[in-house]
């Protein structure tokens, strides 16, 4: 038995200890103790405790120190305290103190002694834990510890060495308590003390990394560190801005001092305020009289009308004294001419309309002191370079040192943009890059997901995607590649339960403004837009962005995904891609530094969960007086169907889930269900799974299994089965120690499909002639060939 073996070991140790006690030094020490010659005893202790034991064997100062300070939680300090409690056997008083401590520890009468006992229980070698002072075992352990103290020169190492011995003493104490019937109170106190210590450590680490970053941002962006007027601070606080964001705090002094700057920052980080606040302060400090008909001193050019309107509203919210005008196409010239005659301080607009006003309506730009080009990469990419150059030529001179202050802002900075900077800026211009070449260029507050989906199934599953990731009351922007596609989805997408409206270039400017205003105010939940809404628009609280097609360009994806996750909020961006579009995702990943998380369509369980949550929220909006009229019918329904069934049916009807359509989680095709076959060992080839499946379900099962693929961890496979074949397959299948057959409710991570290719649809590429794993498809147009030639022998062949 373990106890017997332990007793034998202890007996063996006690025999060795007896041999040690036969040496003349301990006898002489014992005789001196009885004679009370304490001076000689101290000298011997100095000789024996070269490694630091003299402090532990001087009982008088230790007993005095042990009562004053609070108990120490560190193990080394606890061991030192326990050693300090061991009295000198030469005086009888310390032994009485031991017994008194033991008695008080059992009766829980003294809080300080209780703490010492519980701490000594952690160290395992406190004298207060000895149940019977007459037993010689503690004295032997004490001498053994003294011997180890001689051999140890480091106090920390001494504690580490004595730790296993302390545990051994604790075990002896436990066995004695079991025989004598003593209560294990010290053990309980040990557990409580450790729990309290762990709780204290958790409290010290309350601030997460994100909270610490926010705290640092608040300190760095405190208004008191910047020359901002009280009126501007008051206006900013009215908008909920209590400190400057990192991009604003890092660029404020540079812009305020009049230097030229090129700024690259992620979307949604507050670029508008980064140039708006310092320029407002510069113009407010200018003593120039605000005469009627004055020429603008600041011009801000944007690529889109919507961005120009947004910047105008932000500037007007910061200052009431300075005049802000916004000029863009699609609006009457008359109002803009009146604004010119009235006088302008900030001029915001698109290049086309401003150029027309300069040429035909005598818009004076000779007084410009500050020029801002926002989203400059898009502005030059869409063909505004000539118009911008024509506008700026009025004020810019060959000598760049005499030109106005020039500020370039963008989320992406191609190499050619720095050539533009050299053309318009002074030689000593500054670069502020908050993105970096190797870091993630997309918004870090956005989760990037990708769902593989055939083109014919996209409209059918779009409603489930919006429902799960945004809900019935969240805001969603769906980006399309064409105006026609945006219009069709907004009018004919039956899967969308939320109200939706389109936004594209064919709409009149007044209609576009009405649509954006309604979306901001929550009049409708889904905005289906082309690239018009991708740049610069700050629409608050957008929960979800959906790209109806795979992103073709990295810069376009950065701006589209940046419509969510703005101003510190989190968001989700989902890209729907077809099997042949996978290479587009890889290009975006390489260029932006993000990683798409491949997921399947939302499962029926997730859709039902989200719909039920929205239905429950909608119940709170029903007035109490209306509920009174339905209580009678509700009671009848409960009596007829039962409360649970009746309420579940009501929630299903409210959420619109009146029918359930089974769909594949692999490609969203209707009428299929996805199965996961888990393996107990890793597999690296689909043939292992096919062999096991055919052994149980027969050779003809390959016509019933479609789109088989390996799981990412190689611990199984995933495939689709027709809904009508599922029941018979379940009845014929029996789980084994190696394979487990389950119906998939949420798509697991899978490996890249071996049958996928990076070319366009309905095309095949030759090679080794590998047969595709979709066993239904026997067409020659989708199978590989021998390679090298056209036609049946392989090579390249167009689908018919």
From Swiss-Prot:
Residues 252-431 form the Helicase ATP-binding domain. It catalyses: ATP + H2O = ADP + phosphate + H(+). Its EC number is 3.6.4.13. The keyword Hydrolase applies. Residues 114-124 have a biased composition (Polar residues). A motif (DEAD box) lies at residues 374-377. GO terms for cellular component: cytosol; mitochondrion; nucleolus; nucleoplasm. ATP binds at residues 265-272. Belongs to the DEAD box helicase family. DDX21/DDX50 subfamily. RNA helicase that acts as a sensor of the transcriptional status of both RNA polymerase (Pol) I and II: promotes ribosomal RNA (rRNA) processing and transcription from polymerase II (Pol II). Binds various RNAs, such as rRNAs, snoRNAs, 7SK and, at lower extent, mRNAs. In the nucleolus, localizes to rDNA locus, where it directly binds rRNAs and snoRNAs, and promotes rRNA transcription, processing and modification. Required for rRNA 2'-O-methylation, possibly by promoting the recruitment of late-acting snoRNAs SNORD56 and SNORD58 with pre-ribosomal complexes. This is Nucleolar RNA helicase 2-B. It comes from Xenopus laevis (African clawed frog).
């Amino acid at each position: 038995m373990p106890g017997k073996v332990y007793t034998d070991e202890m007996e063996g140790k006690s025999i060795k200890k007896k041999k040690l006690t036969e040496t003349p030094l301990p006898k002489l020490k014992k005789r001196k103790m009885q004679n009370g010659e304490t001076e000689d005893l101290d000298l011997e202790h100095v000789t024996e405790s070269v490694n630091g034991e003299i402090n532990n064997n001087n009982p008088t100062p230790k007993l005095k120190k042990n009562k004053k300070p609070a108990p120490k939680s560190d193990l080394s300090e606890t061991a030192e305290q326990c050693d300090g409690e061991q009295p000198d056997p030469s005086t009888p008083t310390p032994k009485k103190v031991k017994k008194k401590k033991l008695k008080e520890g059992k009766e829980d009468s003294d809080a300080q002694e209780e703490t010492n006992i519980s701490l000594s229980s952690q160290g395992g070698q406190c004298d207060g834990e000895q149940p019977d002072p007459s037993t010689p075992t503690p004295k032997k352990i004490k001498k053994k510890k003294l011997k180890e103290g001689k051999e140890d020169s480091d106090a920390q190492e001494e504690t580490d060495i004595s730790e296993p011995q302390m545990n051994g003493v604790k075990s002896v104490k436990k066995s004695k308590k079991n025989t004598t019937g003593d209560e294990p109170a010290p053990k309980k106190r040990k557990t409580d003390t450790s729990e309290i210590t762990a709780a204290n450590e958790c409290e010290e680490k309350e601030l997460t990394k994100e909270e610490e970053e926010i705290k640092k941002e608040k300190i760095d962006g405190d208004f008191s560190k910047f020359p901002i007027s009280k009126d501007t601070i008051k206006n900013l606080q009215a908008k909920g801005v209590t400190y400057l964001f990192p991009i604003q705090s890092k660029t404020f002094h540079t812009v305020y001092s009049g230097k030229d700057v090129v700024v690259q920052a992620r979307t949604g980080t507050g670029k508008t305020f980064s140039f708006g606040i310092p320029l407002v302060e510069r113009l407010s400090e200018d003593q120039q009289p605000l005469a009627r008909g004055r020429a603008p001193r600041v011009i801000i050019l944007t690529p889109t009308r919507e961005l120009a309107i947004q910047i105008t509203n932000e500037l007007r919210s910061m200052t009431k004294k300075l005049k802000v005008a916004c000029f863009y196409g699609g609006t009457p010239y008359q109002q803009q001419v009146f604004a010119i005659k009235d006088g302008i301080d900030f001029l915001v607009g698109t290049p086309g309309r401003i150029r027309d006003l300069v040429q035909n309506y005598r818009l004076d730009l000779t007084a410009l002191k500050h020029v801002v080009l926002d989203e400059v990469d898009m502005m030059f990419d869409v063909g505004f370079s000539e118009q911008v150059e024509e506008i700026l030529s009025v004020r810019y001179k060959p000598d760049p040192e005499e030109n106005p202050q020039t500020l370039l802002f963008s989320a992406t900075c191609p190499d050619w943009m720095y050539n533009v900077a050299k053309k318009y800026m002074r030689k000593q211009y500054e670069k502020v890059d908050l993105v970096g070449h190797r870091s993630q260029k997309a918004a870090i507050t956005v989760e990037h997901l990708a769902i593989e989906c055939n083109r014919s199934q996209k409209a059918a599953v779009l409603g489930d995607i919006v429902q799960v990731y945004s809900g019935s009351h969240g805001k969603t922007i769906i980006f399309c590649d064409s105006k026609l596609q945006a219009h069709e989805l907004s009018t004919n997408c039956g899967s969308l339960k939320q109200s939706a409206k389109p936004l594209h270039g064919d709409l009149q400017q007044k209609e576009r403004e009405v649509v954006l205003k309604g979306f901001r105010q929550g009049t409708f939940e889904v905005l289906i837009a082309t690239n018009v809404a991708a740049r610069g628009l700050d629409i608050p609280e957008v929960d979800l962005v959906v790209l109806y097609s795979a992103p073709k360009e990295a810069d376009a994806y950065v701006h589209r995904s940046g419509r969510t996750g703005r101003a510190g909020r989190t968001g989700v961006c989902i890209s729907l891609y077809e099997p042949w579009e996978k290479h587009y995702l890889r290009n975006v990943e390489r260029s932006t530094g993000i990683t798409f998380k491949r997921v399947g369509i939302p499962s029926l369980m997730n859709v039902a969960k989200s719909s039920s949550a929205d239905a429950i929220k909608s119940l709170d909006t029903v007035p109490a007086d209306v509920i009174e009229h339905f209580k009678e019918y509700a009671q009848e329904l409960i009596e007829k169907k039962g409360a649970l069934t009746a309420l579940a049916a009501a929630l299903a009807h409210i959420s619109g889930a009146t029918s359930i359509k089974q769909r594949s989680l692999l490609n969203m095709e209707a009428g299929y269900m996805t199965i996961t076959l888990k393996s107990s060992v890793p597999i690296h080839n689909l043939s292992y799974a096919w062999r096991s499946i055919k052994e149980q379900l027969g050779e003809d099962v390959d016509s019933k299994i479609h789109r088989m693929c390996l799981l990412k961890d190689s611990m199984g496979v995933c495939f689709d089965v027709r809904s009508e074949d599922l029941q018979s397959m379940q009845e014929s299948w029996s789980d084994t120690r190696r394979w487990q057959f389950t119906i998939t409710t949420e798509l697991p991570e899978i490996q890249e499909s071996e049958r996928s290719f990076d070319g366009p649809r309905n095309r095949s590429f030759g090679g080794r002639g590998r047969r595709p794993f979709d066993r239904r498809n026997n067409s020659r147009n989708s199978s590989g060939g021998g390679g090298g030639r056209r036609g049946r022998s392989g090579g390249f062949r167009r689908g018919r």
